[in-house]
């Protein structure tokens, strides 16, 4: 059942309410082929083969069917990897069951037992080398986890999970939040209304780079864009500008950041909107633009 259904589900997605047949030809002609197929290499190799086989079979049996290839573009992402651990009896141990003591990896429940450390492999339930996402989110937040996975390497390469990496990403999210607070503080100050368009020029470049890297799956470069943006904005907010210039461009930057750090971006946008309600001269500046 899984083998059969997973080989043509994309056709059903085109006609979810079709009651008499698996799909509607008009819907298929409109939606197919799938624009972008994304999957791990082990899954994609077999599933891609089966799906193409099913599509050819349907095309052969149905002369009105005009789609021979189900997917227009293929992207195989890397896997998230972690070290593997075993006890003396070759039983797999999870990362939560081990700890480092005096440079040695031992079992938490029995520090006298040395743990055999294996190679870093794709996270797998059977090998217990997985990380509980709920613990990561609870300790560091979902955005920090997203940042680390995106920043470590190009998306087609494997990611080596490490505690140091997630901590580094967590600290960067904190730096972004501190920057947000400084920008809010600047909005409450009286600035000379100089026509400083450096922020506007940089924002346009930032949006262009973000869009390009998103379209090309260059997610690790997106994180580099965020670091560059942080450095620029941290210096730029000390310069003279009109409040409306800062507000409008900072909003654009936050919106562009949403696919990368959605929780942070939306929180900042909400706070910024509240701030605008109490910034009366911002409206006055807008009316004069």
Question: Language-model features: where?
Answer:
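Structured secondary-structure scaffolds
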Residues: 1-184, 202-235, 248-255
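Conserved small/polar residues in nucleotide/adenosyl-binding loops
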Residues: 278-283
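Amphipathic alpha-helical
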Residues: 257-276
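N-terminal accessory segments
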Residues: 192-195
């Amino acid at each position: 059942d899984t083998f059969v259904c997973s080989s043509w589900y994309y056709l059903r997605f085109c006609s979810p309410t079709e009651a008499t047949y698996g799909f509607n030809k008009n819907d298929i002609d409109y939606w197919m082929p799938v624009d972008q197929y994304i999957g791990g290499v082990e899954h994609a190799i077999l599933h891609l083969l089966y799906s193409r086989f099913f599509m050819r079979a349907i095309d052969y049996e149905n002369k009105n069917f005009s789609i021979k290839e189900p997917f227009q573009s293929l992207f195989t992402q890397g896997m998230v990897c972690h070290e593997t651990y075993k006890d003396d009896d070759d039983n797999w141990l999870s990362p939560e069951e081990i700890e480092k003591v005096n440079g040695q990896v031992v079992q938490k429940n029995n520090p006298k037992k040395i743990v055999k450390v294996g190679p870093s492999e794709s996270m797998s339930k059977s090998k217990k080398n997985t990380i509980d996402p709920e613990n990561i989110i609870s300790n560091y937040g979902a955005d920090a986890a997203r940042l680390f996975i995106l920043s470590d390497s190009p998306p087609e390469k494997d990611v080596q999970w490490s505690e140091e990496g997630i901590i580094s990403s967590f600290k960067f999210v904190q730096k972004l939040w501190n920057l947000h607070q400084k920008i809010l503080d600047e909005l409450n100050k009286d600035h000379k209304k100089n026509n400083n368009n450096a922020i506007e020029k940089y924002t346009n470049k930032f949006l262009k780079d973000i869009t390009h890297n998103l379209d090309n799956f260059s997610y690790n470069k997106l994180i580099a864009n965020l670091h560059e943006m942080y450095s620029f904005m941290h210096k730029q907010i000390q310069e003279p500008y009109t409040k409306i210039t800062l507000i409008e461009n900072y909003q654009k930057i936050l919106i562009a950041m949403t696919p990368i750090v959605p929780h942070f971006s939306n929180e900042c946008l909400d706070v910024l909107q509240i701030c605008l309600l109490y910034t009366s001269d911002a409206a006055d500046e807008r009316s004069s633009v």
